[in-house]
C-alpha cells in the first residue's frame, strides 16, 4: 500500500505462478490489495502446474474468472511458453485484458516468420479488444518495425531496465 501511495501514477504488475492460485493465502492477499486494483494488474506466468483433481478439470479457468470478478486486470505472460498458449487464451478471452508475447521465443526464427506470427496475435487481440504487449524489444530497429505494424505496447531493455521503487 505504501508503495502504491508513493507512486500513485505508476501501475504495478504482480506476477503469479499458477500454483499460487491454489493457496488460500494468495486470495487473502488479493482481497487485501483489492482497493488498489486500479494500479495493480496480475500477470499469470507461463509455468505449468498440476492442479488438485478436487478443484476440477477447469480449475485454472475458474481461478482466472475469480480474479476478474475481484476487479483485477489480468495479463497472460509469455504466450507460447509453458501452459500459456492459444487454447488458454481462447478459453478465457472474456476474462483477460492483456496478452504478452516475448520475442525471445523467436530467437531461432527468421524475421518474416516472427512478424507473421506477431501479426496474427495482433489481429486476434484487436478482434477481442485485448491489449498486446511485445516483450524482449532490444533495439530501435525492431521497436520501429513493431510500431509500424501497430504494435505500440513494448517492453524490453531498449526501453529501459527495471527500476527499484522501494
Task: Tell me the role of every PLM-derived stretch.
Residues 18-20, 43-53, 72-73, 77-166:
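EAL-family c-di-GMP phosphodiesterase catalytic domain
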Amino acid at each position: 500500500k505504501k508503495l502504491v501511495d508513493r507512486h500513485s501514477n505508476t501501475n504495478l504488475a504482480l506476477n503469479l505462478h499458477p500454483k499460487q492460485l491454489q493457496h488460500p493465502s494468495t486470495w487473502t492477499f488479493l482481497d487485501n490489495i483489492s482497493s488498489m486494483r486500479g494500479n495493480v494488474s496480475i500477470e499469470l506466468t507461463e509455468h505449468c502446474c498440476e492442479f488438485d483433481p478436487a478443484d476440477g478439470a477447469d480449475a485454472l479457468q475458474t481461478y482466472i474468472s475469480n480474479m476478474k470478478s475481484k476487479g483485477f486486470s489480468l495479463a497472460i505472460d509469455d504466450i507460447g511458453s509453458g501452459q500459456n498458449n492459444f487454447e488458454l487464451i481462447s478459453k478465457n478471452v472474456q476474462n483477460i485484458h492483456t496478452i504478452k508475447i516475448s520475442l525471445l521465443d523467436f530467437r531461432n526464427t527468421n524475421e518474416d516468420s516472427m512478424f507473421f506470427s506477431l501479426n496474427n496475435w495482433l489481429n486476434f487481440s484487436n478482434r477481442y479488444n485485448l491489449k498486446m504487449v511485445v516483450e524482449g524489444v532490444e533495439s530501435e530497429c525492431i521497436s520501429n518495425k513493431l510500431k509500424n505494424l501497430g504494435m505500440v505496447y513494448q517492453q524490453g531493455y531498449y526501453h529501459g531496465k527495471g527500476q527499484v521503487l522501494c
